[in-house]
Amino acid sequence: MSADVATAAAAPRLALFDLDGTLLAGDTDVLWCEFLIDEGVLDRETFGAANRDVAERYGRGEVTPAEFAAFYAATLAGRSAEQWSPLRDRFVAIAIAPRIGAASLALVAAHRARGDRLVLTTATNRFLTAPIAALLGIADLVATELEVAPTGTFTGRTTGTVNMREGKVARLARWLSDEGLAASSLAEATFYSDSINDLPLLCAVATPVVVDPDSRLRAEASRRAWPVISLLA
């Protein structure tokens, strides 16, 4: 079914992909927090329950973009990208790569074969998701950006617009401008997402495709006659 969606239109265009719960069977931020707890970097008592709470409220569309971004940005505070990279790379190999299924890779490959420009757009920060985009073979990434101190360490805060909800639409519009692409490209795009948090962007594209949704997004898809596919089978 996913390949049919990818080949439905002949002309190349933007193919936008959410990451967590869409191409990835899991949530990068949640898995990162769990990984750091298991590694002894984060305190289980302090972060374990809070991680689950933020994840559950995010899934229900109840957590604010600022709260979501601040909680997970804080897990990286005090170290530089260079200092974090060995642990980050091991995390991607152990916790992320096995959760990217054949159906997700086939969908991305179908759009690539069609000549579409592939963009991964995610609320998760760029530091964690850049190697995941590379793993998927997606060159363009729009992600939440982390603030870096003059010393080169992450401050534990984000900078700019959090790439979540309406922020995803705003960030993509800015990305189109930066890339010299027409603003109308967004209205002609395809976007794949599992999350009710992505409703603003799903409504902004020509071809919204709902992937393994929860009940709220499934109801929206049914009401709007959007296609629903599964990448988990």
Language-model features, listed with the residues they occupy:
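Amphipathic alpha-helical segments within well-ordered protein domains
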Residues: C33-E34, A73, A206
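A metal-dependent, Asp-based hydrolase signature
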Residues: T28-D29, V41-A110
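Acidic/polar active-site rim loop that often engages polyanionic ligands
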Residues: D29-W32, F68-A69, P150-R157
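Glutamate identity and glutamate-enriched acidic tracts
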Residues: E34, E39, E45, E56, ...
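Active-site neighborhood of HAD-like aspartate-dependent phosphohydrolases
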Residues: S2-R60
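Amphipathic alpha-helical interaction elements
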Residues: L24, R60, A73-A77, A130-A134, ...
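C-terminal cap/substrate-recognition subdomain and adjoining C-terminal extension
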Residues: M1-L14, P86, A93-A233
